Curated annotation (Swiss-Prot):
Keywords (A to Z) from UniProt: Aminoacyl-tRNA synthetase, ATP-binding, Cytoplasm, Ligase, Nucleotide-binding, Protein biosynthesis
Broad class of where this protein is predominantly found: cytoplasm
Gene transcribed to yield this protein: glyS
Organism: Xylella fastidiosa (strain M12)
One biological process term in Gene Ontology: arginyl-tRNA aminoacylation
Compartment(s): Cytoplasm
This enzyme's EC code(s): 6.1.1.14
GO molecular function: arginine-tRNA ligase activity; ATP binding; glycine-tRNA ligase activity
UniProt keyword Ligase present: yes
One protein family per Pfam: DALR_1
Lineage of origin: Bacteria, Pseudomonadati, Pseudomonadota, Gammaproteobacteria, Lysobacterales
Any one of the GO CC terms: cytosol
Superkingdom per UniProt: Bacteria
Name by which UniProt lists this protein: Glycine--tRNA ligase beta subunit
Listed PROSITE patterns: AA_TRNA_LIGASE_II_GLYAB
Catalytic reaction equation(s): tRNA(Gly) + glycine + ATP = glycyl-tRNA(Gly) + AMP + diphosphate
């Protein structure tokens, strides 16, 4: 049985970049494992650990084979007809092969294959020792790491993310002889930079985590995360609050400390006059602090910092954190007060001075387009068009605020606060912020109907603009954020259950964008840039429907639907189901969703596969038809009972499902379609479609055409066929 030993590799460095640390740690771990596996060295993956702190990358494996397995090789020699001459003496071919193998030819074995009998030499190659292979494995692992900005240090030519100061390589209790980037491997690690700044001797990989913990280093990121969250929650409870803990913030802090310790801090209550989102943004993004909220979710004057030490004077540490945060809060308060002085209306007046796009006018022009779209969408989902007009008019004003200029992430949020202060209706103010949802993947859609209207109008205009000026996404480039906007638009429609005609909305958006580009062309053509839109509009009416415009609407529709492919894939929806619905191009995305749900249930029926195969067969027959197919079926031409049986069954299903189809009860429709399997099977078993009699053939093709159309009334079910 192969002997197994624990393996520890630790690379000690200066503080590694916080954002790069997770990927560096993962690549280091995977590189070491891949190197061992490539060499056939047995590893117990169940106990493999990837460990890291800001000052070290480590791989801990509890069971690694001490050597490669033996390799059994076969060297094939000449066949007998070329191995011996006519006198039965070995030829040069046989003697040369034996010499190459280092044996007498008489000791060679013989095997038989399809060409005859030949000589073979079997040899057992002992595996190399793992400790001899580890230096090369480590070198390969380091070379394969994604280092964002490699650096040199001292007089060395080595390149790494940060200077390397020590290297631990223990295989069992033995040090592996190696030298990496000018550092010789040993058993000496280092403790915490401040709490235990001295060498730490490691005798056994199995004790690594415990020995480092005694030196004030939690080398397991999961352990640091657990301690950070537990301490933050405990400290917040002490002051009767609830800590705001986001995954992004915790992930950053985990990679900033080796020995986390929560510190309660506070700031002056006067800063709470500033919108809490600005203060939270400053604490979390700029300083990696954790805000403390009250039971209603309102920000308190308390916050929590995570120190990398256990201080004897926690109050002094807290003062340091408070000194850091105070100037930033003062700036936020200044920006807020300056914005209040000018007011939301004045901010909006400056939008006409900001270019949205050279071919699309200013931000004020964009607001005008969004306003018209919002008015059109509002009554379709039960929202007051006047409110939609008002919220659209105010929607971009905060882009000219000092607050948003300093904190771009607060666009919409700042507008919400300024609208309330200006006396706008609460639902109008909320919609200004709400329309930006979803802001990122996994975020919730807008909560209020008014916010949804504005969000849809905004995204429709952005999409139409992007395509109109040739800013379609290519590869990783998406300057208008069209992919994100398309998915946000689709999610809002589907998750809100809005039965809207997407192509009509895209048509309206494209009209106004085309109008905007016409106006801009007119502006540039005139000597005076002050020519009004009214003057230009006299000369240029809204574009009429054209082939080019229709093609663009289809392109936009396809672009939006394609974004749903990944959305549904994440929900476990098979691609075949998605393709089945997408082929029909439902104009309502909510209708698309309902069809997709129904096809999922239909696919579970025992008849589904057979009907899918039948529909595929029908399509193939119709595609290959070389005669004109009548528009209707003539029952008097039937000469087989299976023909009339199929037509009767089909007409019965059509009658029984007409109401369900009108009500878009697609599950009921597809369930009824399952009744057609027996007559379809009977038809294909008993009837020759391509009969020599052209009248019979044409009539049977007409029957199949009608059947095929109804089988696809919900989705193109042939996609379900395996």
């Amino acid at each position: 049985m192969t002997e197994l030993k624990p393996l520890l590799i630790e690379l000690g460095t200066e503080e590694l970049p916080v954002n790069a640390l997770p990927s560096l740690s993962r690549a280091f771990f995977e590189g070491v494992l891949a190197g061992l596996e490539r060499r056939g060295i047995v590893i117990d993956h169940g106990e493999a650990k990837s460990l890291s702190t800001p000052r070290r990358l480590a791989v801990l494996l509890t069971a690694v084979a001490v050597e490669q397995p033996k390799q059994y090789r076969e060297l094939f020699g000449p066949y007998l007809n070329t191995a011996f001459d006519t006198e039965g003496k070995p030829t040069k071919a046989l003697e040369g092969f034996a010499a190459k193998c280092g044996v007498n030819w008489r000791t060679l074995e013989r095997i038989r294959d399809t060409k005859g009998e030949r000589f073979v030499h079997r040899v057992v190659v002992p595996g190399e020792r793992t400790d001899a292979l580890l230096p090369g494995i480590l070198t390969e692992a380091i070379a394969g790491m994604p280092i964002p900005k490699p650096m040199r240090w001292g007089a060395h030519e080595y390149l790494f993310a940060r200077p390397v100061h020590w290297l631990v390589m223990l295989f069992g209790q033995d040090v592996v002889e190696a030298e990496i980037m000018g550092v010789k491997a040993g058993r000496i690690s280092r403790g915490h930079r401040f709490l235990y700044d001295k060498p730490v001797s490691l005798s056994d990989p199995q004790n690594y985590i415990d020995v480092l913990q005694a030196a004030y280093v939690l080398v397991d990121p999961a352990a640091r995360r657990a301690r950070i969250v537990a301490e933050i929650e405990a400290v917040a409870r002490q002051v009767g609050g609830v800590a705001r803990i986001t995954e992004d913030n915790v992930a950053q802090v985990v990679n900033l400390v080796e020995w986390p310790s929560a510190v309660l801090c506070s700031f002056e209550r006067v800063f709470l006059e500033v919108p809490q989102e600005a203060l939270i943004q400053t604490m979390e993004v700029n300083q990696k602090f954790f805000p403390v909220l009250d039971s209603l979710g309102k920000l308190t004057e308390k916050f929590i910092g995570i120190a990398n030490i256990e201080s004897n004077d926690v109050a002094e540490v807290a003062k340091g954190y408070e000194r850091v945060i105070r100037p930033r809060f003062s700036d936020a308060k200044f920006f807020f007060n300056e914005d209040l002085k000018q007011g939301l209306k004045a901010m909006g007046e400056r939008l006409r001075t900001v270019t949205y796009h050279a071919k699309l006018g200013t931000l004020a022009d964009k607001v005008a387009r969004v306003l018209v779209l919002a008015e059109a969408i509002a009554p379709q989902i039960g929202v007051d068009p006047l409110l939609a007009r008002r919220v659209a008019l105010l929607s971009k004003n905060d882009l000219q605020s000092r607050m948003v200029n300093e904190f771009p992430e607060l666009q919409g949020v700042a507008g919400h606060h300024y609208a309330l202060i200006s006396g706008e209706l609460p639902e109008v103010a909320m919609a200004i912020e709400d329309a930006y949802r979803p802001r990122f993947s996994g975020d919730e859609i807008a909560r209020s109907p008014l916010g949804k209207v504005l969000g849809l109008a905004e995204r429709l205009d952005t999409l139409a603009c992007g395509f109109a000026v040739g800013m379609k996404p290519t590869g990783n480039k998406d300057p208008f954020g069209l992919r994100r906007n398309a998915l946000g638009l689709a999610r809002t429609i589907i998750e809100s259950r809005f039965d809207l005609d997407l192509k009509v909305l895209l048509d309206q958006a494209s009209d106004w964008v085309a109008f905007a580009t016409t106006i801009e062309q007119e502006r540039h053509a005139q000597e005076s840039v002050k020519q009004s839109k009214k003057e230009a509009a006299v000369k240029h009416s809204l574009p009429q429907v054209s082939d080019e415009k229709s093609a663009r609407i289809e392109e936009l529709y396809d672009f939006i639907v394609e974004r749903l492919r990944g959305y549904y894939a994440d929900k476990g929806i098979p691609t075949t189901h998605f393709n089945a619905v997408a082929e029909l191009k439902p104009v309502s995305l909510y209708d698309f969703h309902r069809r997709l749900d129904a096809i999922g249930r239909f696919a579970a029926l025992p008849e589904a596969e057979a009907l899918a195969v039948a529909n595929k067969r029908i399509r193939n027959i119709l595609r290959k038809a070389e005669i004109k197919i009548p528009a209707s079926v003539d029952a008097t031409l039937f000469d087989q009972p299976a023909e009339s049986g199929l037509l009767v069954a089909l007409e019965g299903v059509i009658t029984d499902t007409r109401s369900a189809l009108d009500c878009k009860n697609y599950v009921s429709v597809l369930t009824c379609l399952a009744r057609l399997r027996p007559p379809i099977d009977e038809f294909f078993d008993k009837v020759m479609v391509n009969d020599e009699n052209l009248m019979l053939r044409a009539n049977r093709l007409a029957l199949l055409q009608r059947l095929g159309e109804y089988l696809c009334c919900v989705a193109a079910i042939e996609h379900l066929s395996n």
